Structures are given as C-alpha cells and as structure tokens.
C-alpha cells in the first residue's frame, strides 16, 4: 500500500488506505486546520524530530470507553488518601512540556508539536489534566476534544500514580458529559491495564462519526475544577 504525500491542500486520503503499520500519509504541516481535519477523520500525527511529518490511522485502534476505566484495589486505596489535587486546563504548556521532557531523546513531542497543540488549546480544542502534590505539578495528560470524543496524546508522571489519577478523573468527567470514547491510538499493556481495548478501525470510525454528530465542548475546561474531585468507586 503506498504512503500518500500531502501537499498544501487540506485533504487526507481515507484511513482505510493506511499501510499495514498504520502509516497513511507523509508531509503537510501542523496547522490547527490540518490537525482538526486529521482528528475528524481518525488520523493523527506521530513522528520523530529527524523525520518528516507522518500521519497514522492504525488498525486495530486502541480506545478507552470512559465507563470502563479500571481502578485496581490498590489504586482505590491510594485515591482514598486524597494526596493529590486534580485540575483541568490551568497550565497546558507546562503539561505538554513535561510530557516531552521525560521522553527527551526519544519523543515525538517536538517544539513544533508543542506550539501547534498550544494553539489548539488557545482555540479551546486541546485540553490538559494536571495532578498536583503540595503545589507541585507531578503528573498529567493532554489531548484534543471534538464532539463526544477525546483524543489522548500523552501523559507523564513524576510521582506514583499521578498520571493514573489524572486519567481516572478525566474518564469520570467525560462519562458525566456523555463522551463516547478516548482514542488511545496505539495499544500498550499499561493502557490495557487501565481498561483500554483494541477495536477494528471501521468500528472506531463509526464511533467517531457518532461522536462528531454532537457539539464540541469547546473552551477552557476550568469549570471541572469547581466540581467534586476524583471518585474512588
């Protein structure tokens, strides 16, 4: 299967045309318009600093349904201690920078990625979840929200269970808002342990179509910060 070379024109080939590894296209740019178009079509960018921009739509697709988040017995005990505070959209750039820093030398979160997703955040499409301990940022995640779908990009942790706490809180808030799924993109055992599953790409695209039929919860998500914090059940 050939890999398509993008031009300045804002268009993507159909996701079903991706090669067996999931690579669909190469080139283009990371403008907000192109990124949003990609997510709406089940496509995401993933590349290293020394590579051209690569666009992916793997089959199968790893997703997490918010209601299916797994909270282990040990994690429930940890959450009961209430050691962490979780917030939304209070320091997006700090979160994405930490995601990049902890993968230094082996990261797709390039300066261009940071700038592009920060612009998406300013436009109300990209969001961060932050985990705090005694006033210090110790974990978090970021991603893009369109319709009733959340597209997870990366998470980090510098203390035990900090990123898990952020993800659990996100799932609970998204479930309350009727979100259909979190796109985890590519399978990992860690994601599976948290409840993520692989589904066929065609099924993922059907969920995506259904999710995009709803209005996007656009803007800053700080309103979540006024609500009750993470539940342990």
Swiss-Prot record:
Catalytic reactions of this protein: N-terminal L-lysyl-[protein] + L-leucyl-tRNA(Leu) = N-terminal L-leucyl-L-lysyl-[protein] + tRNA(Leu) + H(+); N-terminal L-arginyl-[protein] + L-leucyl-tRNA(Leu) = N-terminal L-leucyl-L-arginyl-[protein] + tRNA(Leu) + H(+); L-phenylalanyl-tRNA(Phe) + an N-terminal L-alpha-aminoacyl-[protein] = an N-terminal L-phenylalanyl-L-alpha-aminoacyl-[protein] + tRNA(Phe)
Compartment(s) where it occurs, according to its Swiss-Prot or TrEMBL record: Cytoplasm
Sorted UniProt keywords: Acyltransferase, Cytoplasm, Transferase
One of the GO biological process terms: protein catabolic process
EC number: 2.3.2.6
Entry GO CC: cytoplasm
Acyltransferase is among the record's keywords: yes
SUPFAM superfamilies, per database record: Acyl-CoA N-acyltransferases (Nat)
Transferase found in the keyword field: yes
InterPro entries xref list: Acyl_CoA_acyltransferase, Leu/Phe-tRNA_Trfase, Leu/Phe-tRNA_Trfase_C, Leu/Phe-tRNA_Trfase_N
Sample GO molecular function, one term: leucyl-tRNA--protein transferase activity
Disulfide bond positions: none
Family: Belongs to the L/F-transferase family.
NCBIfam families in alphabetical order: aat
UniProt function note: Functions in the N-end rule pathway of protein degradation where it conjugates Leu, Phe and, less efficiently, Met from aminoacyl-tRNAs to the N-termini of proteins containing an N-terminal arginine or lysine.
The protein's name in its UniProt record: Leucyl/phenylalanyl-tRNA--protein transferase
Native source organism of the sequence: Acetivibrio thermocellus (strain ATCC 27405 / DSM 1237 / JCM 9322 / NBRC 103400 / NCIMB 10682 / NRRL B-4536 / VPI 7372) (Clostridium thermocellum)
Name of the encoding gene: aat
